């Protein structure tokens, strides 16, 4: 009589338990990395937007107003005060969105500096604890 090949039910159950234990250890670490990566993207975007705003100020002796917003970096603002020395291609090609699909916000003059650039964070609610702004860069 030939012996049948294959795995017993007990062997399969042991493998499933081991995979479950490994998954319970790995998944929480992956979730934390996603949050860190999202925050790092926001920081990178804020640094790039700050640089573009500084170039705007060098050319026009002022930052765009809150009403003109960050869109003033892509196309010349139509509202007063008009940009005097606006480059043909703008200061950036397009405005990035934060990792949660929202637009970055500009407050000029800012509450924390000359200009505040910020993301509303994961909850999308202004002035909540998860907002990330150019004034928080370097802080935990």
Curated annotation (Swiss-Prot):
<keyword id="KW-0653">Protein transport</keyword>
<keyword id="KW-0997">Cell inner membrane</keyword>
<dbReference type="InterPro" id="IPR050470">
    <property type="entry name" value="T4P/T2SS_Core"/>
</dbReference>
<feature type="propeptide" description="Leader sequence">
    <location>
        <begin position="1"/>
        <end position="6"/>
    </location>
</feature>
<dbReference type="InterPro" id="IPR000983">
    <property type="entry name" value="Bac_GSPG_pilin"/>
</dbReference>
<keyword id="KW-0812">Transmembrane</keyword>
<dbReference type="GO" id="GO:0005886">
    <property type="term" value="C:plasma membrane"/>
</dbReference>
<protein>
    <recommendedName>
        <fullName>Type II secretion system core protein G</fullName>
    </recommendedName>
</protein>
<dbReference type="GO" id="GO:0015627">
    <property type="term" value="C:type II protein secretion system complex"/>
</dbReference>
<comment type="similarity">
    <text>Belongs to the GSP G family.</text>
</comment>
<dbReference type="GO" id="GO:0015628">
    <property type="term" value="P:protein secretion by the type II secretion system"/>
</dbReference>
<feature type="transmembrane region" description="Helical">
    <location>
        <begin position="7"/>
        <end position="27"/>
    </location>
</feature>
<dbReference type="InterPro" id="IPR010054">
    <property type="entry name" value="Type2_sec_GspG"/>
</dbReference>
<comment type="subunit">
    <text>Type II secretion system is composed of four main components: the outer membrane complex, the inner membrane complex, the cytoplasmic secretion ATPase and the periplasm-spanning pseudopilus. Forms homomultimers.</text>
</comment>
<keyword id="KW-1133">Transmembrane helix</keyword>
<keyword id="KW-0813">Transport</keyword>
<dbReference type="InterPro" id="IPR045584">
    <property type="entry name" value="Pilin-like"/>
</dbReference>
<keyword id="KW-0488">Methylation</keyword>
<dbReference type="InterPro" id="IPR012902">
    <property type="entry name" value="N_methyl_site"/>
</dbReference>
<feature type="region of interest" description="Disordered">
    <location>
        <begin position="120"/>
        <end position="140"/>
    </location>
</feature>
<dbReference type="Pfam" id="PF07963">
    <property type="entry name" value="N_methyl"/>
</dbReference>
<dbReference type="InterPro" id="IPR013545">
    <property type="entry name" value="T2SS_protein-GspG_C"/>
</dbReference>
<keyword id="KW-0472">Membrane</keyword>
<feature type="modified residue" description="N-methylphenylalanine">
    <location>
        <position position="7"/>
    </location>
</feature>
<dbReference type="Pfam" id="PF08334">
    <property type="entry name" value="T2SSG"/>
</dbReference>
<keyword id="KW-1003">Cell membrane</keyword>
<comment type="function">
    <text>Core component of the type II secretion system required for the energy-dependent secretion of extracellular factors such as proteases and toxins from the periplasm. Pseudopilin (pilin-like) protein that polymerizes to form the pseudopilus. Further polymerization triggers pseudopilus growth.</text>
</comment>
């Amino acid at each position: 009589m030939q012996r049948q090949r294959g795995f017993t039910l007990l062997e399969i159950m042991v493998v499933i338990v081991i995979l479950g234990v490994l998954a319970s250890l790995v998944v929480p670490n992956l979730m934390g990395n996603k949050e860190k990566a999202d925050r790092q993207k926001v920081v990178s975007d804020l640094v790039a937007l700050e640089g573009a705003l500084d170039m705007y100020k060098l050319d026009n002796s002022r930052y765009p107003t809150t009403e003109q917003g960050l869109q003033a970096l892509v196309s010349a603002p139509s509202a007063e005060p008009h940009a005097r020395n606006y480059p043909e291609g703008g200061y950036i090609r397009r405005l990035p969105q934060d990792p949660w699909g929202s637009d970055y916000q500009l407050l000029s003059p800012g509450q924390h500096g000359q200009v505040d650039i910020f993301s509303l964070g994961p909850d999308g609610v202004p002035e909540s604890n998860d907002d990330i702004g150019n004034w928080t860069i370097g802080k935990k």
